[in-house]
Amino acid sequence: NAAIVRAMTLGESRGLDEETRSRFELSGAYHVLVVSGMHVGLLAALAIGLIRALGLPMGLAWSTGAAVAFGYALLLDSQLPVSRAAWMLAAYLTASAVYRRRQALNVICGVALAFLCWEPAWIADAGFQLSFLAVAAIAGIGAPLAERVTRPRRQVLRDIWNADRDMRLPVEVVVRRVALRDWLEPLSRIVGLRKRWVELALVGPARIGWAAVSVLIVSAAITLVLAAPLAYHFQRLALAAPFANLAVAPLLIVIAPAGFAALLTGALPLFQLATAAAGLLSTCVSWVSQWDGLQYQTPPPGAWSIAAALASCVLLARAIDKGRWQAWMAAAAAAACWVVIALHPFAPDLKKGRLELTAIDVGQGEALLVGLADGEAGLVDAGGFPNFGSDEPSAFDIGERIVAPYLGRRGIKRLAFLAITHADADHMAGAEAVLRRFAPRELWLPRILLSAEFRPLLEAARESGTRIRFLASGDSFAAGAVDVTAIVCELCTGRNDRSLVLVFDYGEHRFLLTGDIEHEGEQYLIAHLNNPHIAVLKTPHHGSRNSTSDVLLKLTHPTVAIVSAGFENLYGHPHAEVIQRLARRHVSVLRTDLDGAATVSSDGRRLEWKAQRHVQEDSR
């Protein structure tokens, strides 16, 4: 709880554990852990309110509020959201001081333009986009819509016994206030309570309810406007955010002021109040984060989808005050764009009629995307960091942070299969994240005595509804128009040599994926490889010295070899001798450590391969 208070007051999030971060991310409430305009505005409002309470001039109050905002920004090293809020507040207060009409959207656009003049590259920065679009959503859609929906109801409920207020209200509001008083007054006599107590008991909850509706409307507006940039940058939609903000909004009003005051005064009771409220916030966020179906992940939208979504939000902002049917039409258009972004009803970035193999750049690990000829996709291994000599898994989830985003950018929503060649962490650590997000129809594993490392993977597969297929040496089956053959040396002594080897046949070309086999495994492969001519070889064991022997290369005659290895890794992969062997046989080499993601594809007759540095074609 203390770490949450530090994050919410000073932007210091290093004390937060990974579980807490994950809960706030899943609930859509992570923004409260990053000091933003909400915190700056609250702090400035407290300063202005304090000056006014002392009876000092309004000009001094405004100047103090702006000074507090800029001082807070300097304290936090002028982080973008804080600086944005400080300058927006200064512009807004300046307009008030010179008696100019204050337009929040004008202030937002003016400050954004000034920031871009200072640093044009910020236009592509996710933080810049989310920061300004969020406040634009509040000012342009959320606040006006909440005002239009809830203001008449709040006018009815506010100070219900004060008949003098009726003179300044619309007729329809007055009629409802009179009817409510006519109902409450006899009720107070029946129950024997004063009218104010009856109002507090019956009208008070209604006021709270309409305040909650306002928070929901504003949160929904932010969710709507941020859908496109969130899906594009993070491939995630925070559907739970409007509900999480019901707890965030009131608790932030307690935590931030109490935390600031505790920092300034050192008062222990204030710090205890802030940590108690932070504990309640953490409980609420944890509960919301467990709601099934509200943590939605989607491939990034295309340029036209983003443009249409943002344009529909602009139309909605303009239509709110135009009339009911215009507002409904604009809202329907914005909702339709949101649904398109969420469902992403587009084919993945895979060419039908081609077999593709892409080595994803996962550092010193391996994750291979296999694009099948029918337009579906599979994955062989899921990356991870080597953990040799350690029982502790890496805190950085390669599957969640690298593999899944790459597959998402390719427009893939579900995998036909996930194959794990063996249980080393650099091949399977990311598999659980891939299973959770892409729910493969099948999980392929070598039919050998399973090690304990496979058990969490099997449990995750069962939870995802994934069929588990154990493959033995010689198993052959079709994956659409592609034939798949498995080779496994079940009697080999080395752990790596028992890797699942897969051969994908399409037309005239064969792709050989060798896992981490070394000398013993290669000998078994050479003895059991029917039709040994190979077009594409995924070099065994990241190109280690004891792999990719001259015998294997002489037998297979590959055209292209892909090496999956980390840049300047500790193991010296790929070994210089392996690169020399490949060069002597005129094999084109693609390396993830130098070229990034490397792709080879075939239409059954012609090979194409590409990486960051070059694109080649071969008809052999």
Locate the predicted segments by residue.
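Aromatic-rich juxtamembrane segments at the membrane interface
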Residues: N1-A86, L93, L200-V203, T358, ...
